[in-house]
Amino acid sequence: MQAVNYENETSYGNLELLAQQVVEGFITGLHKSPFHGFSVEFAEHRQYNNGDNVKNIDWKLYAKTDKLYSKRFEEETNLRCQFVIDVSSSMYFPEPKNNKLIFSIQAAASLMYLLKKQRDAFGLSLFTDEILLNSPAKSTTLHQKYLFTQLEELLHKPKVNAQTNLSEALHQVAELIHKRSLVIVFSDLFNTQTSIDKTDEFFDALQHLKFNKHEVVVFNVVDKSKEVDFNFENRPYQFIDMETGETIKVHTNQVKENYTAAVSSYRQQIALKCAQYKIDLIDADMNDGFYPVLQSYLIKRQKLG
């Protein structure tokens, strides 16, 4: 599912409806995929462990799957998840009504809906070069409505002229949130590319999160066709840095080879370091829709138990 045009959509209910449709479609699709059986566990069950009360085993589900699952109860909260979303200027690329920020908001809302369905707790942090919002993780319906309202308002705000300070934001989040949380970051990692120092600062912040016993998933949100593959018409362009306002005039055919090589090298460097520090780095091409994001979360959630 692609990102949705929000020009005429203004209420909390529209984002919730989108999230519901995405999650229900995803869960339905699991029955036709290698993840068959996970969807039921995600919604209302968890895998049975030795020592669990046998009265809570769902024997009908056992008959279907040949696996033991316990029914979840309303008060159960097994996971605390903090969503950290980059809302700086570069996230408004490539266009006002279909950009990385809209994709990130809709993807995060879908994950929140899934977490609520699992009765897990979730919070939200929004940042540019500073923390704009930090809401702690809760699992109530009222809390979900509050966060969805915050995200809806963000969808309709005009573009901000703000640079990114991802490293500082992650340092603050590491100290503000409950220990042993799952931290899910949506960012284009724009400012980590500007220098080696910025890249090092980014990984210092990730290590801070790991030191505080958090698990970390970074969704590197991109418009792959343009930002990675540099697929533009072969003609002169004026490119504008969305965070600094700096401009440069180039003929795309003359710079494409060097540009794609530099981007590929940088992405490989980030991937290797994330693997070294046991950080889950996931490419999130906004043109691929939300299901890859949900599937990556599902895999991570299964590893966490």
Role assignments for model-derived ranges:
Residues 1-28, 47-52, 61, 70-106, ...:
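Exposed, interaction-prone extracellular/peripheral surfaces
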Residues 42:
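Short hydrophobic/aromatic beta-strand or adjacent loop that forms the aromatic wall/cage
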Residues 55-65:
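N-terminal low-complexity, intrinsically disordered segments
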